Amino acid sequence: MQEGKISQIIGPVVDVDFPEGRLPSILDALTVKREDGSKLVLETQQHLGEERVRTVAMESTDGLVRGMGVVNTGAAIQVPVGAEVLGRMLNVVGDPIDGRGPVNSKKTYSIHRSAPKFEDISTKAEMFETGIKVIDLLEPYSRGGKTGLFGGAGVGKTVLIMELINNIAKQQSGFSVFAGVGERTREGNDLWHEMMESGVIDKTALVFGQMNEPPGARQRVALTGLSIAEYFRDEENRDVLLFVDNIFRFTQAGSEVSALLGRMPSAVGYQPTLATEMGQLQDRIVSTKKGSVTSVQAIYVPADDLTDPAPATAFTHLDATTVLSRSIAELGIYPAVDPLDSTSRILDPNVVGDDHYNTAQAVKQLLQRYKDLQDIIAILGMDELSDEDKLVVSRARKVQRFLSQPFFVAEAFTGLAGKYVKLEDTIKGFKEIIAGKHDKLPENAFYLVGTIEEAIEKAKTL
């Protein structure tokens, strides 16, 4: 064991002196024993000359003093993996934080691993159903693909990701890993209790490094969750679901650490290594010929600006994007997905079939035409439109409302029972609205319902 001594502490960044020629390697984990007997983990980030390393702490550095002994573990941070982590809640270094005793796993993985080789990566395209109409119809998610949920503050990213966990984890028998990166502790607590109640906790591993943690933990916790998912993919050949909330906080933590490590900031004050860090994380989230990792990542958009370097860098790695819009949330339509801004690589007749593809395109054309007419309506009013355009507006408003849906995880707030809508019911409903079968029904009949049959029933009560 190589012993070093702390020489300087600047917030979450700690400098450690080692004897000459015994410097730890970059990314090696070092441990410091605190006075209360607990261990603090540091990760080596830079070599400063022959005898000093600069490290980032994975927990608060309160109580550390110069001269304290530091032990080099000789390896990167190792976290427990395997069946033993299911149903447990861990922190960035793999210690349990659920108060249910130690995790007795037989195997550990390093949080830093190389991405699979190109020849091992699977390229097949196949859709998986989420039960959420707007997603299944307009930006279908691919099995083994990467999906991003983009949105500003308070438009419903976390609620949507919770609903996806609820729908997918219940419908599919696979394992899920949830990484809470720099988000609200309250939401993590709610998720834990909801999973306990719904019974999906036994198939889920939860890893948290929330807002109150130092940047080192927030920067690395996504990698911890990913290593757990990789074990199930590579060693047990399973299809795994990986949920990350929020990938922006990963970038934000990197930017906090970057300045303290003495790097020059790049565009908008982000770290110069932004694209590399994002690439190293995203390149590991892939499906191989053995098993798949299907990932859903919430991505916060600072000030609703999609061109900000953090969300813009994430865009390039994704197969499908679900963009949440404040203007749609203001209309009271939830999930507040922007149907014209959201995209999917597999919305292709060869993958989803002609019926699905044609219906989706017809819905988009109708909504785009309505968007184009909105300026005319705002200036001249509805009366100036031709009869054909009035019909477009009426159907588009029905489609817009039919894209909303009550969520299981929001039952306590809406008072409405959640709905899971099968893909064929979704396609059938939108086809009928576009064909004009329901022109006589009031708009409100389509708001916050599941299938088209429910809309017809609701119309009878209005």
From Swiss-Prot:
It is a peripheral membrane protein. GO terms for molecular function: ATP binding; ATP hydrolysis activity; proton-transporting ATP synthase activity, rotational mechanism. Disulfide bonds: none annotated. GO terms for cellular component: plasma membrane; proton-transporting ATP synthase complex. Its EC number is 7.1.2.2. Belongs to the ATPase alpha/beta chains family. PANTHER family: ATP SYNTHASE (PTHR15184), ATP SYNTHASE SUBUNIT BETA, MITOCHONDRIAL (PTHR15184:SF71). This is ATP synthase subunit beta. It comes from Chlorobium chlorochromatii (strain CaD3). The gene is atpD.
